[in-house]
């Protein structure tokens, strides 16, 4: 019995030795905890990210454009303090930016005694920049009294009289349910309507012929955004007969800017907002896994395609999107990402679907902010470099057989709608 007892004890101690054996420490990221704000620090950060995660693809030169405060969006925001008090404060595009004269003048004007009721109604004032020193203004306020309404009209007269050269329009907007509106992060289910004001709701984009709605999403700093389309053209080298699709398009500036370099250009976004995009065909649809098979179905969609993806806030693409895009075999896929952790996972997902990362172009769209943004160019792995033995087909997208394509004409826009979405 004593021998059996010792055997059992030894057996138990053997199991305990395995159970208590220390596991090797998990890999700890050596990247700095915070992203630097200067361009040299960002360049070093993205190189360290690529080395640490063994990211393939060539890192090209950083895309930067000098930024002036008058070419950026600004905001005067009403903030709540203790005991129900509120204060109006100026918010800029990046830390240390000096407000342009228009913003300072408006901030000073609304603090005058004869506009007290109007000032008390303000939730925020957006200064949407054109990129060439001019602005469109959107005032979100709640006019509860006739006196506040009269003072708002007085404010409009002030803008037309004193700032006719740099203010193209000013509109009051009302948001239901009541909440602070942000063009970059519109609340789902919110309803926005224009009320009183003057001028067009669409303002120019720099010196181009293109325009955007003052409620639409754009980067805060317009100068880098305006020059981005040229950098994308240099990155992908479009050939004659190629076609282009911009997803999460907003005002579709990229697609319109590149329309002369492609045979056809399309843009898609889920937001139903009035837009002026005469050079392209605009689709209102959610960018999900159902969108791409539906879009590429039909004879009119044959050819070599470049798909440009710019998901908001650095978010990952919706589930199933990458396999569906890859199944349509576009010639190029360009992903604009502002989240390197998400980008690492997206690169792996594209690899699994047979698309290899060819180029990395860091872009500086938010100067002075602790953010890193990059364009990632993916191309089909036709040479089998990813270790897959099968032949990579689909150099040219072809119409799927045995499917009804419907009648499509260039004169009619194509609308994709989903139940329950506006």
State what each model feature region is:
Residues 1-246, 255-309, 326, 330, ...:
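Non-catalytic accessory regions of SAM-dependent methyltransferases
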Residues 250-251:
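Conserved glycine-rich SAM-binding loop
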Residues 255, 318, 343-344:
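Short, well-ordered alpha-helical microsegments
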Residues 312:
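Switch II (G3) loop of P-loop NTPases
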Residues 315, 341-342, 384:
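Glycine-rich nucleotide phosphate-binding loop and flanking beta-alpha elements
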Residues 315-323:
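A short, conserved alpha-helix within the catalytic core of class I
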Residues 322-327, 332-377:
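C-terminal substrate-binding/active-site "lid" region of AdoMet-derived donor-dependent transferases
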């Amino acid at each position: 019995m004593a021998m059996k007892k010792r055997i059992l004890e030894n057996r138990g101690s053997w199991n305990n030795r395995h159970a208590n054996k220390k596991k090797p420490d998990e890999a700890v990221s050596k990247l700095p905890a915070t992203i630097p704000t200067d361009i040299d620090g960002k360049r070093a950060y993205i190189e360290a990210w690529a080395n640490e995660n063994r990211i393939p693809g060539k890192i090209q030169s950083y895309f930067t454009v000098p930024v002036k405060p008058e070419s950026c969006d600004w905001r005067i925001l009403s903030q709540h303090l203790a005991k129900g008090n509120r204060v109006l404060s100026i918010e800029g595009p990046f830390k240390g930016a000096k407000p342009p004269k228009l913003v300072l003048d408006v901030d000073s004007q609304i603090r005058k005694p004869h506009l007290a009721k109007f000032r008390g109604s303000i939730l925020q004032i957006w200064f949407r920049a054109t990129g060439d020193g001019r602005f469109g203004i959107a005032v979100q306020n709640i006019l509860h009294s006739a006196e506040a309404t009269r003072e708002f009209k007085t404010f409009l007269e002030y803008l037309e009289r004193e700032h006719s050269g740099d203010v193209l329009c000013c509109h009051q907007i009302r948001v239901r349910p009541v909440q602070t509106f942000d063009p970059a992060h519109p609340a789902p289910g919110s309803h926005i309507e224009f009320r009183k004001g003057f001028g067009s709701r669409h303002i120019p984009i720099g010196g181009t012929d293109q325009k955007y709605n003052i409620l639409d999403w754009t980067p805060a700093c317009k100068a880098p955004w305006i020059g981005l389309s040229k950098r994308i053209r240099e990155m992908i080298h479009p050939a004659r007969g190629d076609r282009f699709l911009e997803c999460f398009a907003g005002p579709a500036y990229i697609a319109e800017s590149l329309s002369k370099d492609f045979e056809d250009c399309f843009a898609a976004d889920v937001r139903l907002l009035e837009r002026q995009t005469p050079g392209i065909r605009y689709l209102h649809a959610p960018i999900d896994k159902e969108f791409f098979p539906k879009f590429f179905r039909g004879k009119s969609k044959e050819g070599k395609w470049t798909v440009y993806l710019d998901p908001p806030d650095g978010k990952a693409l919706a589930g199933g999107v990458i396999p569906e895009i890859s199944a349509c075999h576009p010639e190029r896929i360009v992903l604009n990402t502002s989240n390197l952790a998400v980008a690492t996972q997206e690169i792996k997902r594209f690899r699994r679907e047979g698309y290899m990362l060819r180029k990395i172009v860091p872009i500086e769209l938010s100067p002075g902010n602790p953010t890193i943004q990059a364009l990632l160019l993916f191309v089909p792995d036709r040479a089998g470099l990813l270790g897959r033995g099968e032949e990579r087909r689909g150099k040219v997208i072809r119409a799927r057989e045995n499917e009804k394509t419907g009648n499509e004409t260039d004169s009619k826009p194509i609308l994709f709608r989903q139940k329950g979405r506006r």
